[in-house]
């Protein structure tokens, strides 16, 4: 498993981000999805293939996290192999090309977010099929090289259920074995909710904050294991 750098999050996830499966991290804007993905890549050995579809990956932010943790900047930053995908077609091609790039030296793949271009497409049926194929490629890579795959996901408002829901919920839920939802309660306070896990009870909650170091536990607030 890969550590998240947070004792509480690791405990919530049964030890950390597991290898050989897809882990979905979803939530509204500015809840910490990108920071969490970067931090996991930062703190674990092995290369990271990072596909940025939103322009959210910030080398400056990553460098600040490295500096704040007293890590060696050169060796750490060189672990990240960054790809940009500006539309859904390019995203599909980039994920497919990972089969030629990823090897045993990689510990993680990140697609942040995998639904950014999906949500603006009109032909949702064909796009969902393509999205499923992309997820299958990622799952194949996860199993072949025993690495972790994090796919971040955006949300939409479901008026019928009066709740925020992850985009492409059915196909994402089918392919992703572990699902983590992030929420912002108030400035400086966020929560992570375990929505699905292969062996941990669903509904566990931990609190965290975002600092210069990245994601950090908030010890003063007792983590709850009850469903929201």
UniProtKB/Swiss-Prot annotation:
Q: Does the keyword Magnesium apply?
A: no
- Which keywords label this protein? ATP-binding, DNA damage, DNA recombination, DNA-binding, Nucleotide-binding
One of the entry's Gene Ontology molecular-function terms is: ATP-dependent DNA damage sensor activity
SUPFAM superfamilies listed in its UniProt record: P-loop containing nucleoside triphosphate hydrolases (SSF52540)
Q: Show the Pfam families listed in the entry.
A: Rad51
**Source organism's superkingdom?**
Archaea
Please provide the Gene Ontology terms (biological process) for this protein: DNA recombination; DNA repair
- HAMAP family annotated for this entry? RadB
NCBIfam families to which the protein is assigned, alphabetical: recomb_radB (TIGR02237)
Full protein name: DNA repair and recombination protein RadB
Q: Which organism is it from?
A: Thermococcus sibiricus (strain DSM 12597 / MM 739)
**Classification of source organism:** Archaea, Methanobacteriati, Methanobacteriota, Thermococci, Thermococcales
């Amino acid at each position: 498993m890969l550590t998240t750098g947070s004792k509480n999050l690791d405990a919530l996830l049964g030890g950390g981000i597991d290898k050989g499966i897809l882990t979905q991290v979803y939530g509204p804007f500015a809840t910490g999805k990108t920071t969490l993905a970067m931090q996991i890549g930062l703190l674990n050995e092995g290369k990271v293939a990072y596909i940025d579809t939103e322009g959210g990956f910030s080398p400056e932010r990553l460098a600040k996290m490295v500096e704040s943790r007293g890590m060696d900047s050169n060796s750490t930053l060189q672990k990240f192999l960054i790809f940009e995908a500006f539309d859904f077609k390019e995203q599909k091609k980039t994920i497919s090309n990972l089969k030629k790039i990823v090897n045993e030296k990689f510990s993680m793949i990140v697609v942040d977010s995998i639904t950014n271009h999906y949500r603006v497409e009109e032909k949702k049926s064909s796009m969902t099929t393509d999205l499923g194929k992309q997820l299958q490629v990622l799952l194949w890579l996860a199993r072949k090289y025993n690495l972790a795959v994090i796919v971040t996901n955006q949300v939409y408002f479901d008026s019928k259920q009066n709740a925020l829901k992850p985009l492409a919920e059915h196909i994402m839920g089918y392919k992703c074995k572990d699902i983590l939802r992030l929420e912002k309660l108030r400035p400086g306070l966020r929560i992570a909710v375990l929505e699905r896990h292969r062996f941990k009870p669903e509904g566990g909650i931990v609190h965290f904050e975002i600092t210069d170091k990245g994601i950090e536990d908030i010890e003063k607030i007792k983590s709850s294991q009850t469903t929201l």
